[in-house]
């Protein structure tokens, strides 16, 4: 989920200009091989990009930047190609691909009220179809049978996990815990939904059955707030991002922080840190695993002074 703070246009422009005058952001699209621990740079961008999806055929990364979606070759990265999303030009970093590689689901801030809603469209671009009538809704998962989307939504003042038919319909509330539940993602066999929740006091990774039953805590990181668990395509591993609890509140996932990427067995067990980097928001919001389950993509950042 990417929370959006609505302030006056003048204040927003002032804040943006001040930040731009002081710093410029370099985004580094990287790959990490979990078998060797090796990190490799795919491409650097002199502006902010977020949340790369690795396409099921292994050929492309799809990411968001400045409200639009782009794709870039995973094998021979050259110039990015913009994906036509029609009227949806305020896409945030919550976008996922169908497992058959034919569709993409996006979260777009609608012009009428600025709230994020979920849409689907062909993966090569096209006119988006509205799925969630209510907002805010932040997409994170698509079931492997293609029948349901899972998302985080604020309804009546609380953020919980919901599912909805992928063609639209009545949404189904899956969690009712006090506080933030976020980042729902289906396991490759469709039996479980992984998500993160503050219900234990810190943000931790949880797992439940796809119908919302048997909600079980999966990480117990005493010094970390752990976000966005992503299951590998073979169903064996989970990677997630974590913040130091002394630097970031449990319900926050800001940009431009020192963070770690952690790896754990999908059936539970002790996680291990596999990378340290400067990032946070936009680094690993959505599933970024390669089809071979040996690598995943992420974005790290570098702030450089304009002075």
Where are the language model's segments positioned?
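Sequence signature of WD/YWTD-type beta-propeller architectures
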Residues: 21-307
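Bacterial Sec-dependent N-terminal signal peptides
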Residues: 1-22
């Amino acid at each position: 989920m990417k929370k959006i703070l609505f302030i006056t246009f003048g204040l927003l422009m002032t804040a943006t200009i001040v930040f731009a005058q002081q710093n410029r952001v370099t985004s580094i699209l990287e790959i990490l091989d979990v078998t060797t621990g090796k990190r490799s740079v795919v491409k650097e961008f002199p502006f902010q990009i977020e949340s790369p999806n690795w396409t099921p055929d292994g050929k492309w990364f799809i990411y968001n930047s400045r409200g639009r979606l782009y794709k870039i070759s995973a094998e021979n990265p050259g110039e990015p190609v913009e994906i036509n999303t029609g009227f949806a030009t305020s896409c945030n970093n919550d976008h996922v691909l169908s497992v058959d590689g034919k569709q993409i689901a996006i979260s777009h801030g609608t012009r009428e009220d600025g709230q994020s809603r979920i849409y689907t469209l062909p993966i090569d671009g096209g006119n988006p179809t509205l799925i969630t009538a209510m907002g805010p809704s932040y997409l994170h998962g698509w079931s492997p049978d293609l029948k349901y989307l899972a998302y985080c939504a604020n309804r009546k003042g609380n953020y919980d996990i919901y599912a909805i038919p992928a063609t639209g319909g009545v949404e189904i509330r899956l969690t009712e815990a006090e506080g933030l539940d976020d980042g729902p993602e289906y396991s490759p066999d469709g039996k479980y939904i992984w998500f993160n929740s503050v219900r234990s006091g810190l943000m931790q990774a949880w797992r439940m059955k796809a119908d919302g039953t048997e909600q079980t805590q999966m990480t117990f990181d005493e010094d970390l707030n752990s976000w966005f668990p992503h299951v590998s395509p073979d169903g064996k591993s989970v990677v997630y991002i974590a913040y130091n609890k002394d630097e970031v509140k449990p319900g926050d996932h800001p940009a431009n922080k020192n963070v770690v990427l952690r790896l754990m067995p999908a059936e539970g067990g002790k996680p291990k840190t596999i990378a340290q980097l400067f990032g946070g928001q936009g680094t690993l919001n959505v599933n970024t695993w390669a089809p071979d389950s040996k690598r995943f993509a992420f974005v790290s950042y570098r702030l450089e002074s304009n002075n």
